[in-house]
Amino acid sequence: MAENFMVVDGGVVAPKGFKANGHKDRKYGAALIYSETDAVAAGVFTTNKVFAHPVALSKDVLVNNNVFRAIVANSGNANCFTKGGMEDAKALVKKAADLLKIPENQVLSASTGVIGRRMPMDIITIEVERAFKNMNLENSNENASKAIMTTDAFPKTVAVEFEINGKNVRIGGIAKGAGMIAPNMLHATMLGFITTDIEISKEELTDSLQKATDESFNNAVVDGDMSTNDTVYVLANAQSGVKYTDCKADFDGALAYVSKELAKMIVSDGEGAKKLIEATVHGAETKEDAKKASMSIVRSLLLKTAVFGADPNWGRIAAAVGYSGAEMDMANFDIIISDISLENQAFLVKAGEQIADCGTPELKLAEEIMKEDKIKIIVDLKMGSFENTAFGCDLGYEYVRINSEYTT
């Protein structure tokens, strides 16, 4: 389906009726996102059995409440696996609720940072207060995005707009994430906060978010580690005057786009990463097989290091698909290295036969393509009609340095 929207500025404050801001002082930061009117909310969370206190708290709040007004998030501390962590999570929510003059059960929360250390509430509280004081600043969206960064190299934000019967609907988002990215969020450290002014029910929003997440955040891999804190929220406040039932396909497509763009920004910012990898597997027997194979490619450390060195070692791609669990016939599949625009494509394997070898034009073309900062790996399994695209990044020396020094 053709995209029926345009990209606009503003991130989470692009939709009508939303304010936001953030503040960070060296290691610790806090962000606030606020709807001026009642909103419905949906959330998806990490499936890690070791999960942070704000994850537990917000899961419960989402189940037991139908009206929401705000999201509060802190960086620098994960608030996970500590005595008193739930007390700290509730205190963070209470601080935001008091400042915004709304009930505590209308606030969702999230944290990111080091696991196993008690939250420095005296510092975090000050950061929340600073974020609240300047929620009308022109650069408030960027401030909120920067405030939740940890090892991120750049803030991640996107917004889109589409028109229905003369009225505009907007969806905006911010995210953080660079390491510990291999989410599996069902019902993604990675945080994503999305706002929209569509009129939609809680059930419809939850369903739409789950579908968007499965095609975006759950297809993103930096290092294969699933965080204890992965969370994505959507707030919808109905201020556009457009009902979801009048634009279901348009809204779902726009939400999926926002989610995918945020996911791609996250993997592009993988700790020390220089290159974005998009791995598309088509011709799979089932959707599950397509996902298994594409995720296996972007998760492979050998493939990641090959991309880092611009080495078109197609055997690593074939091996990753082979051990993924997807059905395949090694005598009949294709492997292609392409630029992101699909204008330049190098066949490495065709119908199970090696095309690229030392000195061949195909191998030389693949080497040149792999020097670019965005590359696409295409595998045709020739087993069926299903496909999936996963997102990953290269892996180099800087990743080891960052993670060997993280808690110090």
Swiss-Prot record:
Catalytic residues of the enzyme: T189 (nucleophile)
Site positions for Involved in the stabilization of negative charge on the oxyanion by the formation of the oxyanion hole: T112, G113
Enzyme nomenclature, EC number: 2.3.1.35
Source organism superkingdom: Archaea
Main enzyme class: transferase
A GO cellular component entry from the record: cytoplasm
InterPro entries on file: Arg_biosynth_ArgJ, ArgJ-like_dom_sf, ArgJ_beta_C
SUPFAM superfamilies cross-referenced by the UniProt entry: DmpA/ArgJ-like (SSF56266)
Name of this protein: Glutamate N-acetyltransferase
